[in-house]
Amino acid sequence: MEVETDKKKLIESFRLHEKDTGSAVVQVALLTQKIKRLTAHLQNNRKDHSSRRGLLRMVNRRRKLLEYLNRTEPEKYREMLSRLSLRK
């Protein structure tokens, strides 16, 4: 249940309107949370190659969403980078 409550709080803090659950901003925030969790898992389980592959897919998907956000809404892109402590 902890993951679900974290996810709901994250969606509430990044959503653009009342029913927003799938905008690029929310997707980037959720992917960042999953990436952090999976990175911690992989530090303890170095031989978990399937999780490493999943991590690489998530990082690539987040990168593409951030590129889209930068292309369409540069202000929100910069805000996302600062709020999530991402470097670009």
From Swiss-Prot:
GO molecular function, one term: structural constituent of ribosome
Cross-referenced InterPro entries: Ribosomal_uS15, Ribosomal_uS15_bac-type, uS15_NS1_RNA-bd_sf
Keyword Lipid biosynthesis included in the entry's annotation: no
UniProt keyword RNA-binding present: yes
GO cellular component: cytoplasm; ribonucleoprotein complex; ribosome
Keywords: Ribonucleoprotein, Ribosomal protein, RNA-binding, rRNA-binding
GO biological process entries: translation
Domain of life: Bacteria
Annotated Gene3D superfamilies: 6.10.250.3130, S15/NS1, RNA-binding
Pfam hit, one: Ribosomal_S15
Role description: One of the primary rRNA binding proteins, it binds directly to 16S rRNA where it helps nucleate assembly of the platform of the 30S subunit by binding and bridging several RNA helices of the 16S rRNA.
PANTHER family: RIBOSOMAL PROTEIN S15, BACTERIAL AND ORGANELLAR (PTHR23321), SMALL RIBOSOMAL SUBUNIT PROTEIN US15M (PTHR23321:SF26)
Family: Belongs to the universal ribosomal protein uS15 family.
Subunit description: Part of the 30S ribosomal subunit. Forms a bridge to the 50S subunit in the 70S ribosome, contacting the 23S rRNA.
Full protein name: Small ribosomal subunit protein uS15
